Amino acid sequence: MELAKRFVDVGIFTNRLDEMRAFYGERIRLPYEEMLPVGAGVRQYRFGLLGSVLKINHVRDPIPARVAGGYRKLSISDPRTPMPLPMQDPDGNEVELAPSGQHGVNQIEIHIGVTDEAAFENFYADALQAERIGAGRFKLGETIISFRHDPAAVRAEKSPTAGAADAIASMRAVGMRYITVQVRDCDGEHRRFMSMGVWEGAAPVTLGAVARISFIRDPDGNFIEISQRASLTGPIPA
């Protein structure tokens, strides 16, 4: 997979905008970048995350509570931290500041609770072509993604492929709900995923002159956005 950016982005949904912005901007001290109106009552507040972007999607209407499993913890490398500092954000998402280099993390690590570790090993090695650095640990660019069995995790039921707007709507619940991988060729990567039998979340769609995106889902149904962003790759083909 040809990456356009060597850092994976993290998407959070929340109803508690002020508290979440204060936590990540003031307590964690991530630099605020910009707000993007997503539509359908959603505004995305973007924070720099050591090359990644933390996307806080504020939803105007009430959304369901956090669910077990899935993207469960975010570890952030922090040279100011002499020892691991576990905490929870205002929505209860697990966040950890960790000394730089601890367990090989010099950027961020995304932790996933899964139903079947073997299925995730195959998915990240074969479909996402990530570098295996240990049992249940892979490196995608500079970002580490790890997973372990979670008895509370539940595999989503497969449903007919929806459009991107419907896929985003189905993610709406409190918590870390998706990750974004920036690639050179969204359509080419999506075709490759489909040829391998990867679970489709949504077919590619163009977002004006900004990006072309699609969604795939991991073996448990967690969403992964595949994004070809014009600011990284040049103009989006017509």
Give, region by region, the residue ranges found by the protein language model:
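Short acidic/glycine-enriched loop/turn segments that link adjacent beta-strands
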Residues: 39-43, 141, 207-212
